[in-house]
């Protein structure tokens, strides 16, 4: 992981200096991501700087643009390695996060990681298009996030039924 000072500077650059207080948990996330990525393909970007800038900072940018209410429920569609939902949960511990992914092995990674990081989160093993049609999940979330899931038209069809 990049140094604490570099992380503080990065968080200041994206206008979210409060996230810098979670440096230790972001560092643990980075280490675990790199270790798990050797066993299963979670991401192509695994170098310390790339993880900090392209994964963590990019995932946190929406928090600087949208005011989510305290305690908002967030579904992270196609969670994969946890981006953007887990960095958002680290920066905003009041968010109620559900990770939705079609592959159980990714959810296993996220379940173990969220436990290590002390982040309460729900895991939903499903395809987004199916979850959106399920009464248990349809219109149950305040906000949906996704990253590298589908083109915008398809992504809207996956996410809109959930919020």
Show the residue positions of the predicted features.
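Conserved SAM-binding loop of SAM-dependent methyltransferases across substrates and taxa
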Residues: 81-94
């Amino acid at each position: 992981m990049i140094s604490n000072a570099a992380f503080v500077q990065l968080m200041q650059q994206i206008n979210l200096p409060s996230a810098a207080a979670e440096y230790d948990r972001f560092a643990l996330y980075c280490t675990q991501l790199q270790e798990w990525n050797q066993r299963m393909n979670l991401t192509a970007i695994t170098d310390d700087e790339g993880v900090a800038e392209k994964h963590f900072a990019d995932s946190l940018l929406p928090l600087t643009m949208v005011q989510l209410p305290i305690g908002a429920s967030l579904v992270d569609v196609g969670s994969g390695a946890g981006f953007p939902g887990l960095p958002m949960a680290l920066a905003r511990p009041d968010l109620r996060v559900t990770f939705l992914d079609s592959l159980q092995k990714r959810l296993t990674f996220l379940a173990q990681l969220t436990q290590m990081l002390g982040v309460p989160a729900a895991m939903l093993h499903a395809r987004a298009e199916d979850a959106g049609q399920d009464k248990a999940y349809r219109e149950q979330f305040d906000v949906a996030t996704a990253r590298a899931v589908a083109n915008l038209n398809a992504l809207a069809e996956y996410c809109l039924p959930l919020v």
